[in-house]
């Protein structure tokens, strides 16, 4: 049995018969009153995100989660097929479980999949990925109504904001947590 002091990002809790993945947490010790833990967590089955506050030191039940490296192979309709890099077994993961990770996944890319009792719970991507710009309008230096960014579509079909100097065919580094542009990548 763990306590709320053991909560960190990626922890999976069992609450009211449901599994919840901790997305964000913050231990708070106010000057007056008892300490508490503020969390943002996602229901593993429904995908619903809720904010919940726990008293510090409260006993909680955590789920045993196995995290393994998998290679993304291909998309099969709404599902995604991954291969375990250790024993070469293939697993199929639903599009709902993969979620927004599809915006940053390329074939043969390595990802980390959290599995509980044989069921994939969620996909963990690396903090950043390198993607190629497949479409963007030419950016004119004097044509500015904002801070000098323009929309660009990457090879996965996801649209990001890039600086005006980025052109079609450029490889860029993208933050997988929020989809923001991190910089150009030189080959």
Swiss-Prot record:
InterPro entries: Elong-fact-P_C (IPR015365), NA-bd_OB-fold (IPR012340), Rib_uL2_dom2 (IPR014722), Transl_elong_fac_P/YeiP (IPR020599), Transl_elong_KOW-like (IPR013185), Transl_elong_P/YeiP_cen (IPR001059), Transl_elong_P/YeiP_CS (IPR013852), Transl_elongation_fac_P (IPR011768)
Coiled coil: none
A GO term, aspect molecular function: translation elongation factor activity
One GO BP annotation of this record: peptide biosynthetic process
Places the protein is found: Cytoplasm
Keywords: Cytoplasm, Elongation factor, Protein biosynthesis
The protein's annotated pathway: Protein biosynthesis; polypeptide chain elongation
GO cellular component terms, A-Z: cytoplasm
Short name of one Pfam family: EFP_N
Summary of the function given for this chain in its UniProt record: Involved in peptide bond synthesis. Stimulates efficient translation and peptide-bond synthesis on native or reconstituted 70S ribosomes in vitro. Probably functions indirectly by altering the affinity of the ribosome for aminoacyl-tRNA, thus increasing their reactivity as acceptors for peptidyl transferase.
Family of this protein: Belongs to the elongation factor P family.
Name of this protein: Elongation factor P
Organism the protein comes from: Paenarthrobacter aurescens (strain TC1)
Lineage: Bacteria, Bacillati, Actinomycetota, Actinomycetes, Micrococcales
């Amino acid at each position: 049995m763990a306590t709320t002091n053991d909560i960190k990002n990626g922890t999976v809790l069992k609450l009211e018969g449901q599994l919840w993945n901790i997305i964000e947490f913050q231990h708070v010790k106010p000057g007056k009153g008892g300490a508490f833990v503020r969390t943002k967590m996602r229901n593993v089955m429904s995908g619903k995100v809720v904010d919940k506050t726990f008293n510090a030191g409260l006993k909680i039940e955590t789920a045993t989660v196995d995290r393994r490296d998998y290679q993304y192979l291909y998309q099969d309709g709404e599902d995604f097929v991954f291969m375990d890099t250790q024993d070469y077994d293939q697993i199929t993961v639903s599009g709902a479980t993969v979620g927004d990770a599809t915006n940053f996944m390329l074939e043969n890319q390595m990802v980390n999949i959290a599995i509980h009792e044989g069921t994939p719970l969620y996909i963990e991507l690396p903090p950043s990925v390198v993607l190629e710009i497949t479409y963007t309008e030419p950016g004119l230096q004097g044509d500015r109504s904002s801070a000098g960014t323009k929309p660009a579509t990457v090879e996965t079909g996801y649209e990001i904001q890039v600086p005006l100097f980025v052109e079609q065919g450029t490889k860029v580094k993208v933050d997988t947590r929020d989809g923001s542009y991190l910089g150009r990548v030189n080959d």
